[in-house]
Every structure is written in structure tokens, then in C-alpha cells.
Regions:
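Non-ligating segments of multi-cofactor redox enzymes
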Residues: 1-211, 229, 247-474
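Hydrophobic core positions of alpha-helical segments in small-molecule transporters
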Residues: 169, 221-224
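Inter-helical turn/loop segments and adjacent helix faces that build the functional surface
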Residues: 210-214, 238
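Short linker/helix segments within small regulatory modules
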Residues: 213-221
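Juxtamembrane amphipathic/hinge helix adjacent to a transmembrane helix
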Residues: 226-248
């Protein structure tokens, strides 16, 4: 055990004046955890106490501030630090400590559970029932139910198994954190004679930080930083972005499927429904025509037929394109389909989390900033002026954000090139494998280009993408 390490590498965040305090000082971390928990509980309470649309605090706390602003921004910068301050994980460590500490049954040790909860429980409902999650009461019930369920799991099972397997965003956070330019590890020279393993003992997830470098993986680390308070030989290093994805590591099937399904549910579906759906020829697209046809025979009521079919087509097309592309790529590489699929599928990581930054920045400056701040003003009854948007949709500088999705495409291609190095095949075979294995990246690129072409050629649909009123009543 190292009690105090005086000299740290230049890229070690723990050795940096301000960031070192933010990420290593346990008092500071605990304050942030308590504040996050307090906001979470108050947001749920407000959803029950004031379930009407006037309560903008609950809506924009969960669906503006936590998701997607804080989570996406931190995932691409420092990694899954939201998990380190998550109210469920924060309280879960203490519940587990006094719980039954049973092994989670194998049928529950399935990371696809969390992915499907997110995919169907959030995104499918988001498109099928527009505005459902905007209702404060629905949001309150969702997070109250998840909290009760999580606490039961923490009490029953050891090693924070709920976070690993059943949390709706657990696998998503673990997968996309590989994009970030940070990596938790240890100083090898300090660890070589260690026999007490305080960093591993302190970890509530039963992980061994001293093995992360060798495995080229932080596994299920949530950056709670408990290990760094137990031993000063732990480092939180700034590394090359996507460093892990450029090298060999043990793949996990659920991670690749998280990339595929989230890209399909967010990037592709929004490209169909919110992108092309705002063009003058929206009625000519297959999901629109299918919706019109289905409505002749089915009463959708309050459901959005267009949203349902845009989501369905985007998901099916994405999966089919990936399967066909990877199958052909496996033939060129003379490798099994499984190895090809799950080794090269990590190239899809940047599409949503990097490409989505363009929409995130645009949305934040043109309405989410005001929504979030005014929501907090309402929630805490502050007697101050409501704020206005930081920018207008007509501001010329917003056009420069359109380059970000193309950077995500280049990033995905670069990851794929490096992961193809893990296969033994001739250069010409790898070239053809690259063309087909990158099918989802190319599909994403094509959607960006085509959407721009349609807007330029046919223009926007009248009254498209109008934003809700900013009037907020106390």
C-alpha cells in the first residue's frame, strides 16, 4: 500500500492542482454525491407533488440536465463519472454492505437486460407516445420504481450486481466510456511488491485496478474513486482518446449490441423522424407511407404511427446492414462471424456519442439551457428573472456544428482500421473487409449527406420543428 505518492506522471489527473481535488478528494466527491442524490430525490418528489405540465423542474432535471447534457458531455471527456455520483450506486454501496450478499443467479447476470430496458422502456415509448416522458408524474413513477427495484437488488446480491447487469444505462455507460481520453490504472513499480491489494479490497464492485493496464480494460469501474483513497498508487491518466479501442481486449457482446441499438434508436431514428421528418417530402418516405397505410386498418389513438414506423425501420435497417456487412467481412478475413462481428463492432462507438454532440450543443444553446435554468427557478421557487435562450436556430455559427457527425464517421473508420490489425489476412482482404464491416458507419454517413441534400433540394416542411412555449407559470 502506498500512503502518499509525491511524484506522479504528467498525464495523471490526480497530480493536477484543480482536477486532482475534483477526482481524488473524498470529501469533495461525497459532497457531489449528496448533492446529486438530493436533486434526484427532490425531482422525484416534485413529480408526484406537482404532476402538471407547469412543473418543468422534474422534466428538465432528468431529461435535460442529467440526460443528455451531463452524461454525454462527461462520457466523451472523463468517462463514466456519472456512475460514480449516481444516487443508486451511492446508496447501493451501503445497502450492499448490510445486505444478504448473495451471488446473483446466472439468468440475471445478463447485460442485455439493462440494454433492453433502456431500448424498449425509454426509446420505444419515446417515439410511440410523444410527450409521455415529458409528463412529470410519468418521470417520477419511472425513477421511483427503478430506485425501489435497484435497492432490492443491492440488498439481495453482492458486488453491485445491479449496476453491472440490470441498470438501464450501466452497459451503455461502460461501453461508451471507451471513447473517453481517460483511463484508471496503477503505477506498476509501486504495485509489484504489493501483497495487501487495498485498491481491490476497497472496490465495491470487486474489481482489481492493478490489472486494468494488462487487460486494456477498466471492466465495470464506475470511477467512484474508492480505490484511490485506499492506495495512492492508483492513477487516473489522460490517454489518447479511444485508446482501448485501438488495441486488443476481451470483447463483450452486450457492448457491441449497445452501440448498434443505441445508434439505431437515437442517431438513425432521429435522422428519419426528426431529420427527414422536417423536410417538405416527409410523406414520401417509407415509414410515413407505412404509417398512413396502417392507420387505415388500425386505430393508433394517442400513439404516433409515424414515430413507431420510423423507429422500426431504423432499427431493422441498422441490424440488417450490420449483419450482412459483418458476414461478408468475415468471409474476406477467413474468420468466424462471431469474432468478426464482436471485434470490429466497436468501430460503431463514436456514431452516437460523438456524432450526437452536434445536436446536443445545438439543443442546449437554442432551448435546453433556458429550459433547465427556468426549470430550476420553478423547482426552487426562486424570485429571479427567467433566462432566455443562448442562441437562435437562425444563428449562422450553428452550421459549423454539422462537421461533428463527419468527425464521428472518420473516428469510426479509424477505429475499424486499427481493429482490423487484430486479424491475420492480406491487405487486399482487409480492404474489402473494411468496406463491408463499416456498413453501419457508412449508413450513418449516407443519412447525414442525404438529409442535407433533401433540405437543400426540397426545403423544410412548413411549421417544422417548432419548439414549445417558454412561458412558465409559478
Amino acid at each position: 500500500m502506498i500512503k502518499f505518492k509525491q511524484i506522479r506522471d504528467k498525464n495523471d489527473i490526480y497530480g493536477m492542482p484543480i482536477l486532482g481535488t475534483i477526482f481524488k478528494n473524498q470529501i469533495f466527491i461525497r459532497v457531489i454525491q449528496v448533492l446529486t442524490l438530493s436533486l434526484f430525490l427532490y425531482g422525484v418528489y416534485m413529480g408526484f407533488a406537482e404532476p402538471t405540465p407547469e412543473n418543468t423542474f422534474t422534466r428538465y432535471l432528468f431529461w435535460g440536465f442529467f440526460w443528455s447534457l451531463f452524461i454525454v458531455v462527461t462520457l466523451t471527456s472523463f468517462g463514466r463519472i456519472f456512475c460514480g455520483i449516481c444516487p443508486h450506486g451511492f446508496l447501493g454501496k451501503y445497502i450492499t454492505r448490510f445486505g444478504l450478499k448473495k451471488d446473483m443467479p446466472n439468468f440475471l447476470k445478463n447485460r442485455f437486460i439493462g440494454i433492453f430496458l433502456l431500448f424498449f422502456g425509454w426509446w420505444a415509448i419515446y417515439y410511440a407516445v410523444p410527450g409521455f416522458w415529458k409528463v412529470p408524474l410519468a418521470t417520477a413513477w419511472l425513477f421511483a420504481s427503478l430506485t425501489i427495484f435497484a435497492f432490492i437488488m443491492y440488498y439481495l446480491y453482492k458486488d453491485m450486481s445491479y449496476c453491472k447487469y440490470m441498470c438501464p444505462i450501466g452497459t451503455l455507460m461502460k461501453s461508451y466510456s471507451k471513447i473517453s481520453p481517460t483511463f484508471l490504472n496503477t503505477y506498476k513499480d509501486d504495485c509489484k511488491d504489493c501483497r495487501t491489494f487495498e485498491c481491490a479490497t476497497a472496490c465495491p464492485y470487486n474489481l482489481k485496478p492493478f490489472t486494468f493496464n494488462k487487460k486494456n480494460s477498466m471492466e465495470d469501474c464506475t470511477l467512484c474513486m474508492d480505490c484511490s483513497s485506499a492506495c495512492d498508487a492508483v492513477a487516473f491518466s489522460i490517454v489518447k482518446p479511444s485508446k482501448t479501442l485501438f488495441e486488443k481486449f476481451k470483447f463483450q457482446k452486450a457492448e457491441v449490441w449497445a452501440f448498434i441499438l443505441i445508434t439505431a434508436a437515437i442517431s438513425m431514428t432521429m435522422g428519419f423522424h426528426h431529420g427527414l421528418g422536417r423536410t417538405a417530402i416527409v410523406d414520401d418516405f417509407i415509414w410515413s407511407k407505412t404509417a398512413v397505410f396502417a392507420q387505415q386498418y388500425i386505430d393508433f389513438g394517442t400513439l404516433s404511427a409515424q414515430g413507431i414506423f420510423a423507429f422500426t425501420y431504423a432499427v431493422l435497417l441498422s441490424i440488417i446492414i450490420v449483419y450482412i456487412g459483418m458476414y461478408i467481412a468475415s468471409k474476406f478475413l477467413n474468420e468466424s462471424f462471431e469474432k468478426t462481428f464482436y471485434t470490429l463492432g466497436y468501430a460503431f462507438a463514436p456514431l452516437f456519442v460523438i456524432g450526437g454532440l452536434a445536436h446536443l450543443i445545438s439543443a442546449f444553446t437554442t432551448h435546453n439551457y433556458a429550459d433547465i435554468v427556468n426549470g430550476f427557478i420553478y423547482g426552487f421557487g426562486l424570485n429571479i428573472e427567467h433566462v432566455n435562450d443562448l442562441a437562435s436556430r437562425r444563428d449562422s455559427w450553428l452550421i459549423y456544428l454539422k462537421v461533428i457527425p463527419y468527425l464521428a464517421v472518420l473516428w469510426g473508420y479509424l477505429i475499424l482500421v486499427n481493429r482490423l490489425k487484430l486479424f491475420k489476412a492480406s491487405k487486399i482482404r482487409k480492404l474489402f473487409a473494411f468496406i463491408f464491416a463499416s456498413s453501419l458507419v457508412t449508413f450513418y454517413l449516407s443519412l447525414q449527406v442525404y438529409t442535407g441534400y433533401v433540405f437543400k433540394t426540397y426545403g423544410a416542411k412548413k411549421s417544422s420543428h417548432s419548439h414549445h412555449s417558454k412561458t412558465i407559470k409559478h
